[in-house]
Each structure stands twice: as C-alpha cells, then as structure tokens.
Amino acid sequence: MSEMIYGIHAVQALLERAPERFQEAFILKGREDKRLLPLIHALESQGVVIQLANRQYLDEKSDGAVHQGIIARVKPGRQYQENDLPDLIALHDRPFLLILDGVTDPHNLGACLRSADAAGVHAVIVPKDRSAQLNATAKKVACGAAESVPLIRVTNLARTMRMLQEENIWIVGTAGEADHTLYQSKMPGRMALVMGAEGEGMRRLTREHCDELISIPMAGSVSSLNVSVATGICLFEAVRQRT
C-alpha cells in the first residue's frame, strides 16, 4: 500500500522527517530548476530510486495539480485514531488544540494544518463525516505540516468536545454574531479553538458545546474571511496570550 505526494516542500519535509517511507520518486524530464537539484541529491543520498517522467504522467498522478516537477510514492504515515487523543493531551500541561467543523476543501485543510504547525498546536481534530481528506493536495498546501501535526478524525464531534471539557480544556468557538472579539477573550491555558465551515459556520450541536464564542472584528466591507485565514488570526492571538 502506498500514496503519492507532490511538490518541492511536501517532498522535502517528509524526506527530512521520515526518509524510510520513500519508495520511489518521479522527476519531470528536462526540468532545470535550482530548487529541485538539492532535493534530488538528498533523495539519492537516502537510496531513493529516481525516475524521469514526462509532464503528462506527472499531471495524471497529481490529478492535474501543480506538482512543481516532482512526485514521490511513499508508504502511508501513521493514522491517528480517536482513542489516541487522551494520550496526546496527557503529554502537555497546557494542551493547545484546533477543531475544524465542516472544512471540506483540501486546500483549506492543508492551510489550516500549516498555520496549526506554525502556532504550536498539539493536534487537529475533525469529524469523520464532514471533513476534507488528507490527500496529496492538502499535504502540498500544508508544506510539511501534515507530517508533524497529528490529525485526528472522530466519529462524534460533540462527544469528543465533552471529553475535552472533562479534561478541563476550555473550548472557544468562532461565530460572527458573538458578543465579544477574540482580542477580549482569555486563551492562555488548556484550550481548543473551533473553526466552522466557510459561510455556514459551526453546526448547531458543535456551537452548543463551546464554552465561549468569539468573533474577529471586521473593519472593511467584506463580511467574512477564508477559513484558513481566520484560523491563522485566531491561533496566533492565542499564541500571543500563551507566551
């Protein structure tokens, strides 16, 4: 069993973290890119078989996405399960979690993972039935974060949120109609940030299980932000308060 990853950053990040997972790599024939050369040398030094391929082959393997002239076939990484969450929480005095409710676009999932990694989030939680898959597109956008931040899919998000509350984790949800902003919120301790789907927001049951609702103040004419942008803003305000 194997999976494909593509893009310079995604391949490089996995090679640095888990070179043993690589089975083979495909490089665009005739591609002269200074960014690719060090990566090719690094792959060769790890004994990875490298094959030259035409653009049509790479486009097909990446479903027409921007692959930057490199694709790798790798062994699947660790798949975190719902029952791994308590152990992950126990590793930290102040767990810092991100919950994505209804983020179904793999580009947004990848961007949220990238922001989560940069902010030091310990795990990202998503519902099994209403979330984008962690496919090659999401991994490319994540620029390596998909290999470092545990992504946990849960069967019942509301039940998981209750479990977090039993672990004394404060759950902060985002909603445009919230009566105070993230800058008025207190987020220095054990916490989980909940982001809803773009346009729709959190589902009713998810919202009801939040301890607090916050909004992002908007000064211009637009009514909302892309979910990955909003996630980054909220995460780094939490980081500011936690440091």
Swiss-Prot record:
Assembly and interaction partners: Homodimer.
Annotated catalysed reactions: guanosine(2251) in 23S rRNA + S-adenosyl-L-methionine = 2'-O-methylguanosine(2251) in 23S rRNA + S-adenosyl-L-homocysteine + H(+)
Tagged with keyword Transferase: yes
Entry EC number(s): 2.1.1.185
Origin superkingdom: Bacteria
UniProt cross-references to CDD domains, sorted A to Z: SpoU-like_RlmB
Record keyword Methyltransferase present: yes
Listed InterPro entries: 23S_rRNA_MeTrfase_RlmB, Alpha/beta_knot_MTases, Ribosomal_eL30-like_sf, rRNA_MeTrfase_TrmH, SpoU_MeTrfase, SpoU_subst-bd, tRNA_m1G_MTases_N
Gene: rlmB
Function: Specifically methylates the ribose of guanosine 2251 in 23S rRNA.
Subcellular location: Cytoplasm
HAMAP family: 23SrRNA_methyltr_B
Top-level class of the enzyme under EC nomenclature: transferase
GO MF annotations, alphabetized: RNA binding; rRNA (guanosine-2'-O-)-methyltransferase activity
Record NCBIfam families: PRK11181.1, rRNA_methyl_3
Pfam family, any one: SpoU_sub_bind
Membership in a protein family: Belongs to the class IV-like SAM-binding methyltransferase superfamily. RNA methyltransferase TrmH family. RlmB subfamily.
Protein name according to UniProt: 23S rRNA (guanosine-2'-O-)-methyltransferase RlmB
GO CC, alphabetical: cytosol
Annotated keywords: Cytoplasm, Methyltransferase, rRNA processing, S-adenosyl-L-methionine, Transferase
Organism per entry: Salmonella typhi
Residues the record lists as binding S-adenosyl-L-methionine: G196, I216, L225
